Amino acid sequence: MSNFYKLLKEKFPRKEDIVTEMINLEAICQLPKGTEYFISDLHGEYDAVDYLLRTGAGSIRAKLLDCFDWQKIVAVDLDDFCILLYYPKEKLAFDKMNLSASAYKTKLWEMIPLQIQVLKYFSSKYTKSKVRKQLSGKFAYIIEELLAEIDRNPEKKSYFDTIIEKLFELDQVEDLIIVLSQTIQVLIIDHLHVVGDIYDRGRYPDRILNRLMAFPNLDIQWGNHDVTWMGAASGSYLCMVNVIRIAARYNNITLIEDRYGINLRRLVDYSRRYYEPLPSFVPILDGEEMTHPDELDLLNMIQQATAILQFKLEAQLIDRRPEFQMHNRQLINQVNYKDLSISIKEVVHQLKDFNSRCIDSKNPSRLTSEEEELLQQLMIAFQTSESLKKHIDFLFEKGSMYLTYNDNLLFHGCIPMHSNGDFKSFKIAGKTYGGRDLLDLFESQIRLAYARPEKHDDLATDIIWYLWCGENSSLFGKNAMTTFERYYVSDKVTHQERKNPYFKLRDKDDICTALLQEFDLPKFGHIVNGHTPVKEKNGEQPIKANGKMLVIDGGFAKGYQKNTGLAGYTLIYNSYGIQLISHLPFTSIEEVLSGTNYIIDTKRLVEEAKDRILVKDTTIGQKLTKEIKDLDHLYRHFQEYDD
């Protein structure tokens, strides 16, 4: 320990430095805890996610009601002002086009003092240094001056007005308004929790990741779709063809080709050479229109080619990993190639739209030399994409399989269980894992695989694929993934995927208490869970187990909204308690600007704090308390740690 305190003394070489830091940390501990925002299953739907981050899921509007007496500010419309705070660039352009020049200037004059007052109100729960870090360098000094003078002596009004007038003269007012709005947006959410699945069927997971990379404080709990992209970057051929197949299925190849710069030309040529469009592989467009009909056919053929490659590679993996106990999923090996049928649970089914041209009936899982070369070329393209690497690096830096934070347990999928509530076990390398140990194993293997991207069929890389579709995967949560059956078998009984018992057991208070204990959390904590859409229109509720379990699948994917009856949930945890937010579908920014698309549906109080929660009561507060103790020890034994 003496070395630790000697190093600490180098950072604080004078006793007065220690006193200053201790007072600063003690003061921070007495501030209200910052607002945490939980969001899950983003599924590439950038505009809807961006809207919620801009608005703080309605928190900005709610705080504005506390900040002003709007009955006295008759000249300003609350909703109109909110839109300026949410979409400042777009709102300014909209007003400029729809107002006269004089009316537009008058409106800008009215907005700036209001924005300054809002910023001051929103920043009151933070230290000055924290607020200063969020201010734009361009206007930092000016904003600090305006913040200092907004509520002071009326005699200084001319000082305030002179600053604004000069900004008008220099044509900088619009830029200032934009910066003020953006700063307010940042301050409304102190910490963001992304509970998995940034990727999936939506078109812009890359834009979401770019947005998240600019966020000051956040963490990510990986989802099953995230892990397949991480697996592709880690060297898994299976994960790679899977993400291409899904992109083709949902008309999102442009993400791979145009925005990640991954060349698919050889795959396109291969797909055209061996496949032709078939009904089972018609892309799902989620209401979007294709500008070129030929593109539909191409996506159809790419989807077929990658599906067959996936089933071949899957059969190979299952052969080399008997411990995965997935031999019943080697369906490409179980096909009767004489009549193109398959027996599933002792029932023979005729295959539909099954192109076996590239399959050796004597060794169905064997890749042709052309396919091997194709996969190698694709892997090089994936692993040398700088933009993809930037995003995957970020997922590894900020992500984990689960997180314990402020007495809450966050994870995406499930904790695999038996129907009696015992943890399901997964035996690997002679050792059995379950519960928390299982998730720790999965995370260590994911990180090991990414550290060795040149290895394509080692255990760590294969476990990433297991996380996508294995029965004991905490990210999948079902007994089998029936992709093969959904493509090739008409009988929908074969398409069924049985959920792990966890998804029924999580309704029970005692089960959730046991889960919290497994992760060393108190019984009054909460579990925040994503992954499964809540079918509220069928009576399902997102608040379970007497408030211990909170299911917050964001419902952003348009394809799920018709089944759920709404657009999902997010969660706010501030110094007053926990609120569950339900959402309506996001339509467009244009409708937001016109005031016709406010997607916050309802807010439900999950838990109200008895006393206002302070920083000292949080995970960060525990760290600060330890720092204070260390500083106090150094202060009292200052001379003992001289070199």
From Swiss-Prot:
Protein's gene: fbp
A biological process term (GO) from this entry: gluconeogenesis
GO molecular function, a single term: fructose 1,6-bisphosphate 1-phosphatase activity
UniProt entry tagged with the keyword Cytoplasm: no
Catalyzed chemical reaction(s): beta-D-fructose 1,6-bisphosphate + H2O = beta-D-fructose 6-phosphate + phosphate
Record EC number: 3.1.3.11
Pathway connected to this protein: Carbohydrate biosynthesis; gluconeogenesis
This protein's name: Fructose-1,6-bisphosphatase class 3
EC class: hydrolase
Annotated family: Belongs to the FBPase class 3 family.
Cofactor: Mn(2+)
Species annotation: Streptococcus agalactiae serotype V (strain ATCC BAA-611 / 2603 V/R)
HAMAP family in the cross-refs: FBPase_class3 (MF_01854)
